[in-house]
UniProtKB/Swiss-Prot annotation:
It catalyses: D-threo-isocitrate + NADP(+) = 2-oxoglutarate + CO2 + NADPH. The keyword NADP applies. Induction: Expressed at the protein level, as evidenced by antibodies present in the sera of patients infected with tuberculosis. May form homotrimers. Also forms homotetramers at low salt concentration, which are dissociated into homodimers, but not into monomers, at high salt concentration (1 M). This is Isocitrate dehydrogenase [NADP] 2. NADP(+) binds at N87, S89, G587, S588, A589, H592, R603, D605, R652. Keywords: Glyoxylate bypass, Magnesium, Metal-binding, NADP, Oxidoreductase, Tricarboxylic acid cycle.
Length: 745
């Protein structure tokens, strides 16, 4: 990328956002071209990442570049500008489905070896591990996070409030978390006084030393943590909570983050399934072992593995599983109509999305009968689950929040360089036997941190670098100064890791002019209470948080304030000087794809993409002096405001305006704004004809976009849809397509 040709890299991802991109990219290119801005697409879908991982299994024509690695390299350059859409954080079942689809399309990628026996199978599984979970974000997020609700979006939510369930003081909904034996209880932390190489090893009681991670390079000033979760304590906790829910008649729900925490949380999830169905597992364990059943991947794995059994044997197992429900609590459902429960797949119920949805619904989730019910929300790890209990307490006492009057909670998140738990996957292990787990200096043999562990415990090491902490503090002060809002650092002095952070935050705040700013440090629970008390009075508070709370709170507060987290402006000021603009935080919406394929209606709202693009143009304008880029950003913001005021967002209902119609209206309003502005006459003239054609043909174009709805469509794949077929589905208006081509001609 050069100063002469500023470039915006627009990521091609998965599911609903990918489908929307087929319609939106031609619009973006038509508007960016006159400003001399190049729009480059980069495919980082799960399918593309699988193909990039296995070039040696493909023909020359089938090979694809490793776009994710290239984007990772570009984040280290000062002029990089990336629009990052939500992508699938693949669970094992999703990965297996993507592999099969690619194989069916003629790509000879290897099968996923769930239980590798040979060295080759182990190597293949290791390569596929790079495609699992949140594989994209740690590579691209080379900066801290600045997420906030844009003014136009907040105003719209106040004028057009979304539905909110009522909270009752009599609600039986509550959060259950471990009181001992979890990561919080077993955490140790230190700040390094010099650079070191360390290894992670287990001194087993049997006398042998097992090296789990031979080398982890560390720098001066790094904060490192050692923490473990006891398998015994976790299983006892599940048994107690299931029994309590059964006896009190409250529905049981489990909330983990198996997508991001791709090593630890599937294990945590699997233990819950085994405890719930312990009688069936006790009876059939030998058979399950022979079949390779792994309920860390959910009950769906068990059901698929027993498919090959004779009908009588299969029916007996299913009957035994059903019999377990007689003395277990009712389970929260993902899809009541299809009988899919909370335990079906670890990626179905993700804590950062499921807890806010439950709180928005007045503390209720769906039961097997399709009715909303109070629930015991089980979040085993106490470190962050207590914030949810605090907001539940607040809602029980004060009632539901009111979107028409409530304040806003922007987030400044410590995220850069795989900070904290979200960078721990390659340093997380299921302990093979009892012993002592040590983090040891490779050169000197000095034991830095040590834990007494037992077989089955989950042990992990986390790191946060010094430079991201400095940058995080700087970003928090900057946002406080620009916005005039108070900043609250959500840090618990009783948690060893966060106590180390508090020392650094206090030190680095001295590097900035904080006169007149309200900056405080409080524990998570106190921070939640303080923020809620301000929120309900219409007051705004910036939450400066670590990486996990960044993830949790940028779903929680937007869902309460705006009805969705997809409408947030998410800026990642890259530490090398570039910028990445993430489009919302609401996932990639598989149900939206289902509706498109069945009814040719895409209800995905591209507002997040619109907002990110505006910020991307503005960034180019500021950094390169490109006045037209600034104008594109300014007029796009005005068009977004008009889109919201005129209620032209997608409807959920087939036959009404969908994503394609919403994008048309954005293009029309944007062209109108550019034609009407007086800062650049040449640009105004260039877009006057487009504005005229779109305005005159509004009814025709909307009709062309809606009359195709109501019938099934074929896009030639799910994880790797056919480009031509998807383009035909997503761009059905000949009039609109011709107008865009004419303005580029």
């Amino acid at each position: 990328m050069s100063a002469e040709q500023p470039t915006i890299i627009y990521t091609l991802t998965d599911e609903a956002p990918l489908l929307a991109t087929y319609a939106f990219l031609p619009i973006v290119r038509a508007f960016a071209e006159p400003a001399g801005i190049k729009i480059e697409a980069s495919d980082i879908s799960v399918a593309a990442r699988i193909l990039a991982e296995f070039p040696d299994y493909l023909t020359e024509e089938q090979r694809v570049p490793d776009n994710l690695a290239e984007l990772g390299r570009l984040t280290q350059l000062p002029d990089t500008n990336i629009i990052k859409l939500p992508n699938i954080s693949a669970s094992v079942p999703q990965l297996v489905a993507a592999i099969k689809e690619l194989q069916d399309k003629g790509y000879a990628v290897p099968d996923y070896p769930a239980d590798p026996k040979t060295d080759q199978e182990k190597a293949i599984k290791e390569r596929y591990a790079r495609c699992l979970g949140s594989a994209v974000n740690p590579v691209l997020r080379q900066g801290n996070s600045d997420r906030r609700a844009p003014k136009a979006v907040k105003e719209y939510a106040r004028k057009h409030p979304h539905s909110m369930g009522e909270w009752s003081m009599a609600s039986r909904t509550h959060v259950a978390h471990m009181r001992h034996g979890d990561f919080y209880a077993g955490e140790k932390s230190m700040t390094l006084d010099r650079a070191r190489n360390v290894r992670m090893e287990l001194l087993a009681k049997s006398g042998k030393t097992i090296v789990l991670k031979p080398e982890v390079p560390l720098d001066d000033g790094d904060v490192i943590d050692s923490m473990f979760m006891s398998k015994k304590a976790l299983c006892d906790f599940y048994e107690e909570q299931m029994q309590d829910a059964f006896e009190t008649g409250v529905m049981f729900s489990l909330h983990v983050k198996a997508t991001m925490m791709k090593v630890s949380h599937p294990i945590v999830f699997g233990h819950a399934v085994r405890i719930f169905y312990k009688d069936a597992f006790a009876k059939h364990q030998e058979l399950f072992d022979d079949l390779g059943v792994n309920v860390n991947n959910g009950l769906s794995d068990l059901y698929s593995k027993i498919e090959s059994l004779p009908a009588s044997q299969r029916d007996e197992i299913i009957e035994d599983l059903h019999r377990c429900h007689e003395h277990r609590p009712e389970l929260a459902m993902v899809d009541s109509a299809r009988g899919i429960s909370n335990f079906h797949s670890p990626s179905d119920v993700i804590v950062d999305a499921s807890m806010p949805a439950m709180i928005r619904a007045g503390g209720k989730m769906y039961g097997a009968d399709g009715k909303l019910k109070d629930t015991k929300a089980v979040n085993p790890e106490s470190t962050f689950s207590r914030i949810y209990q605090e907001i539940i307490n607040f809602c029980k006492t004060n009632g539901q929040f009111d979107p028409t009057t409530m304040g806003t909670v922007p987030n400044v998140g410590l995220m850069a360089q795989q900070a904290e738990e979200y960078g721990s996957h390659d340093k997380t292990f299921e302990i093979p036997e009892d012993g002592v787990a040590n983090i040891v200096d490779v050169a000197t043999g000095e034991v830095l941190l040590t834990e007494n562990v037992e077989a089955g415990d989950i042990w992990r090491m986390c790191i946060v670098k010094d430079a991201p902490i400095r940058d995080w503090v700087k970003l928090a002060v900057t946002r406080a100064r620009i916005s005039g809002m108070p900043v609250l650092f959500w840090l618990d002095p009783y948690r060893p890791h966060e106590n180390e952070l508090i020392k650094k935050v206090k030190t680095y705040l001295k590097d900035h002019d904080t006169e007149g700013l309200d900056i405080q440090i409080m524990s998570q629970v106190r921070s939640m209470r303080y923020t809620c008390e301000r929120l309900v009075r219409g007051l705004d508070t910036i939450a400066a948080t670590g990486n996990i709370l960044r993830d949790y709170l940028t779903d929680l507060f937007p869902i309460l304030e705006l009805g969705t987290s997809a409408k947030m402006l998410s800026v990642v000021p890259l530490m090398a000087g570039g910028g990445m603009y993430e489009t919302g935080a609401g996932g990639s919406a598989p149900k939206h794809v289902k509706q498109l394929v069945e009814e040719n209606h895409l209800r995905w709202d591209s507002l997040g993409e619109f907002l990110a693009l505006g910020a991307g143009f503005e960034d180019i304008g500021i950094k390169t002096g490109n006045e037209r880029a600034k104008l594109l950003g300014k007029t796009l913001d005005a068009a977004i405001g008009k889109l919201l005021d005129n209620d032209k967002s997608p409807s959920r209902k087939t036959g009404e305006l969908d994503n394609r119609g919403s994008q048309f209206y954005l293009a029309m309003y944007w062209a109108q704004e550019l034609a009407a502005q007086t800062d650049d006459q040449q640009l105004a003239e260039h877009f006057a004809s487009l504005a005229d054609v779109l305005t005159k043909n509004e009814d025709v174009i909307v009709r062309e976009l809606t009359e195709v709805q109501g019938e099934p469509v074929d896009i030639g794949g799910y994880y790797a849809p056919d480009s031509d077929m998807t383009t035909a589905v997503m761009r059905p208006s000949k009039t609109f397509n011709a107008a865009l081509e004419a303005v580029q001609g």
